[in-house]
Regions:
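Long amphipathic alpha-helical segments with strong coiled-coil/leucine-zipper propensity
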Residues: 105-213
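Basic amphipathic recognition helices
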Residues: 202-226, 230, 242
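Alpha-helical oligomerization segments
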Residues: 222-291
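Short linear sequence motifs
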Residues: 59-62, 72, 89, 204, ...
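Residue-level detector of solvent-exposed, low-hydrophobicity positions
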Residues: 22, 73-76, 86, 103, ...
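Solvent-exposed flexible segments
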Residues: 154-158, 170, 174-185, 217, ...
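Extended, helix-rich scaffolding/adaptor regions
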Residues: 1-154
Length: 291
């Protein structure tokens, strides 16, 4: 799992604490890292024993009140090693959401994904209303003399710019995977970008549903996928477990979003950020409560 040069804003301060499965038998013996990641912190006890913890919590993404990550990491380890029982998969995903502080905080901290979701609605909703040529002009994406997949690459860059943070990176990866639905339509290089004008009229809803499914899955793998790598019997077993998780999340999310007003998701909709965050919360709630 890539952590980047700094601690991922997706994860709480205690994420790297020992979880009972650590490769280091004494994780408490590791020196505490300063923000620059190079020097151990001096052991100067604070008058307020919770002061340091409070400071770290405030530096987390959107400052949600995270709970311990140990149950999430332990249950994912059990599931990956085949010791989780019949409910191993559901428990692993449920504890993962709980470790984000519950469905509300899991949704609230997914800011990059929320922005990208709205951007998908803006772009493909615009294609339905105005046509792809006009929408590309609106987004300053050149067409002349370019292959469709080159144009699609620009569309991805507009909807989810090159990431600066791990949060952005997961959101972008989810978009790239979601856009495979569109890329596949241009496997025949003779096809023109105007093909987008003839897509299913519900393409915006289809892509938004796929994006939310994919983001939730990719975020889980980013956060606790290392448990699968370490505890699965081999690479084939790990791939099977990841596939099971992906299908489980996709089923729950698609069912949750089935009758939701996805077609109105765009920047012109009043309180659209609240609307989209609410959709993420509902999806996370279903996963948290194992509904």
């Amino acid at each position: 799992m890539y952590g980047g040069p700094n601690r991922s804003p997706l994860l709480p301060p205690d994420f790297n604490d020992g979880d009972g499965n650590s490769d280091n038998p004494n994780p408490q013996d590791k020196p505490e890292q300063q923000p620059d990641g190079n020097k151990p912190a001096e052991n100067n006890p604070s008058e307020n024993p919770n002061e340091n913890e409070s400071t770290l919590q405030e530096s987390s993404s959107n400052n949600p009140q995270y709970t311990s990550w140990r149950p999430a990491k332990n249950s994912m380890s059990k599931y990956a090693s085949g010791k989780g029982g019949s409910n191993g998969k559901r428990n692993a995903v449920s504890n993962y959401v709980k470790s984000h502080g519950g469905s509300q905080n899991a949704a609230k901290s997914a800011k990059s994904a929320i922005r990208t979701t709205i951007s998908i609605g803006d772009f493909f909703g615009g294609v339905k209303q105005k046509g792809i040529t006009q929408v590309l002009k609106d987004f300053n994406i050149p067409i002349e003399g370019r292959k469709p997949k080159e144009i699609l690459n620009d569309i991805v860059n507009v909807l989810a710019p090159t990431p600066d943070l791990n949060d952005d990176s997961v959101a972008r990866k989810a978009l790239v995977n979601t856009m495979s639905i569109i890329y596949e339509k241009f496997d025949d290089e003779k096809k023109d970008i105007s093909l987008l004008d003839s897509l299913d009229s519900d393409i915006s809803k289809i892509l938004i549903t796929k994006y939310i499914e994919t983001f939730i899955y990719e975020r889980l793998i980013h956060d606790v996928g290392s448990r699968i790598e370490k505890k699965a019997e081999n690479s084939n077993a790990a791939a099977k477990i990841e596939k099971e998780l992906k299908e489980y999340i996709e089923t729950k999310v698609s069912t949750t979003l089935k009758d939701k007003p996805l077609s109105i998701i765009n920047s012109e909709t009043k309180n659209v950020n609240v609307l989209v965050e609410g959709l993420y919360q509902q999806c996370y709630k279903v996963l948290e409560d194992q509904l």
